[in-house]
Amino acid sequence: VESGIAKGVDALLKYKGKKLYIWAVYSLGLITRNDGEREYNPHFDRRHNVNFVTSYKFGKNESWKTDIRWNLGSGFPFTQTQGFYENLTFSDGINTDYTTANGDLGIEYADLNKGRLPYYHRLDASVSKSIKVNKKVNIDMTASVTNAYNRENIFYFNRVKYERVNQLPIMPSFGASITF
């Protein structure tokens, strides 16, 4: 049975005006687990996290709106690779010719979750327009972009292929909704 401790603190600033909304939060957290053999930081332990959100309404009848969200987070823990070795299976028992046999790739790991991935950050933005067709029908159109400056945030590292796998690239999107 594992046990653990999670502790942290948040600082929040918020402004809400007629046209402008601003929200900023900083979170400091520390999570540790103990599996009976060792204490370690789990893979979701993010020490520092900053979110900044702003929304602004403008235009005739405030029918236009822009939204921006920026997020910065310290890297998650991961277990580093110390090295590789050939892991022979000895499938023929004592008769296995280890001089010509091809083994599987074995990985030598460092201590559990002692490494940290690089910091994560991205900017998402959108602009939307609301069109009131009549008293009962409204059309909302939105254009948005996720990861606006195309930050290459790491998702994980493929140890076998020795290849970095990133999270979302820049992703534009468009949408519309009709309410009645």
Task: Give, region by region, the residue ranges found by the protein language model.
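Sequence-level detector for tyrosine residue identity
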Residues: 15, 21, 26, 40, ...
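Gram-negative outer-membrane beta-barrel transporters
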Residues: 1-77
